[in-house]
Amino acid sequence: VKKRELACFGGLTMVCRDLGIPRRRIGANARFRSRVKSGSGRFAMKFSRQTTLRSHATVTGVGVHSGLPVNLTLGPAPVDAGLVFVRTGLDEADREVPAVAGSVVSTDLATVLGDRQGPLVSTAEHVLAALRGMGVDNATVEVDGPEVPIMDGSAAAFVAAIDQAGIVNQSAARRYIQVLKPVRVAMGESFGELRPHTGGFRAEVEIDFANPVVGRQNFSIDLSPESFRREISRARTFGCMNDTARLWSAGFALGASFENTVVFDDTRLLNPEGFRYSNECARHKALDAIGDLALAGLPLLGA
């Protein structure tokens, strides 16, 4: 069944991961800012200094694609460190990879980060969304397996871990990337766009599936820790049961289940508990976009 997805995400045009659109450098269409005027939005005003985690917090689960058990630990990091993955459990020494666009080695059904030696951490987008959405600038993400645990398919467990660790202000001012003019990348009827916006960061998503269970859904959000927690942190990843055999044969979705994925067939939703939101699929696309946009390396001011 041919599906059509329309996506307009505030920020970088590298967000269309599932569409195979290549990640692009921001170039002349953005600039860095270390201060934000008082009229630039609640998120920017409230968090004027860089933040990190007060302590460590660990979650345990399985990888949605690998099916392997994995432990993930969030921890503090110094000023200007950014978000850094630390791959442990290897035969050799632990390896670090910064959460930036240049670290992306694959976008086939998930965002995979790595270095010159190869892939290190897959399915990074949900934990990155939680860290960016909750306003954490600098943190380490230790993972002892090849993939971030899927948990319940949303970012809720990572938000809970951030709450457990606590957030503290640091000594340096927060820096931003401000979008200066519109830029669009398109593939067929699908596109990703970034444009200027004076109110912090706003994401707008529209998806349109031929499958009537999903259909056309819209969602928009002015991002803040409160709105992220309330509006999208609990939105789960989703997929069609008809795609299962194809995904399994390609080595994907080996850890997927009704406990961590919204599953539907041609006519109905198969999860007994139903949707968490009427437009949960669009909300989850926004979650994925926020996570991928964290690879810009700094918070975005745009829409």
Predicted features, each with a name:
Residues 3-6:
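Positively charged N-terminal leader segments that act as targeting/secretion signals
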Residues 34, 38-40:
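Serine residues within intrinsically disordered or low-complexity segments
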Residues 41-138, 142-303:
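C-terminal regulatory domains involved in ligand/effector binding and gene-expression control
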